[in-house]
Amino acid sequence: MKPMCIIAALSQLAVALPAGAQDKQTAVANFVGKDGKEDGRAQLTAAATGGVLIELEISGLPANKWVAFHVHETGRCDAATHHESAGGHFNPEKAEHGILAAKGPHAGDMPNQYVGQDGVLRAQVFDSMVTLDGKTDGIRGRALMVHANSDDYRSQPSGDAGERLSCGVIQ
């Protein structure tokens, strides 16, 4: 009877391990606006070949406008400091800012995103320069940020993207 219990326990453990591995391939970020209230959510999924797919929906943003979207270096979203607590763009390679910069981009630089007429940003963005849990390029524990203006993809150090409107810690 004891060997049968051990086999049953081991088989349950074997089934549980792949599920745990799957959890490491995903993350979430709950966004907080300037007022400190939750205004959106992102689901992040690690791609098998590298990079991370970010699917997000954030409300309460300026309607009909392109806005900058970045990964920031620090996983702190403090509305009292206008989300300055999130630090600068995630940049493990010490590159220049911007996808149009000769020595860029930062790993956290991503294309501008469009906010619809309803003030909601809905997007799917792929960042090929990051992973969820890599030693140098991992973004779990860092922050996603939506800015008030579009990124010009060149200005140093942050693309003249303007005020930080919404921030979410990647967990």
For every predicted segment, state its role.
Residues 17-171:
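N-terminal leader/targeting pre-sequences
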Residues 5-15:
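Bacterial N-terminal signal peptides
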